[in-house]
């Protein structure tokens, strides 16, 4: 069965594993998912990620991050632009998540960027997700 929205599936698996306090989660690999994982790592929401070759394709293994008393680093994830309703933002009107405490992941002509990186470079694009 084909997946309609692989990015939403990626975010849902992360959200579910985070809610269940799993240490890591295995996901089907794709370049865009690896780029999103890289942004999450750079922003401090996950501890690390790597790819593994499986029998039927690559897997992306994401290690989740928790605080000293097991508090979650990811409080919430939300898919913004969906296949049925795309959401775009101009460079002058980029979204801010929780007043700058969260991160918006934006697909631009320069690749995947956070809202702060896109504002610094003066580019807009498709708003993929909010993370806080």
UniProtKB/Swiss-Prot annotation:
It comes from the Bacteria. SUPFAM superfamilies: Ribosomal protein S8 (SSF56047). Keywords: Ribonucleoprotein, Ribosomal protein, RNA-binding, rRNA-binding. One of its GO terms (cellular component) is ribosome. Coiled coil: none annotated. GO terms for molecular function: rRNA binding; structural constituent of ribosome. GO terms for biological process: translation. HAMAP family: Ribosomal_uS8_B. Belongs to the universal ribosomal protein uS8 family. One of the primary rRNA binding proteins, it binds directly to 16S rRNA central domain where it helps coordinate assembly of the platform of the 30S subunit. Part of the 30S ribosomal subunit. Contacts proteins S5 and S12. This is Small ribosomal subunit protein uS8.
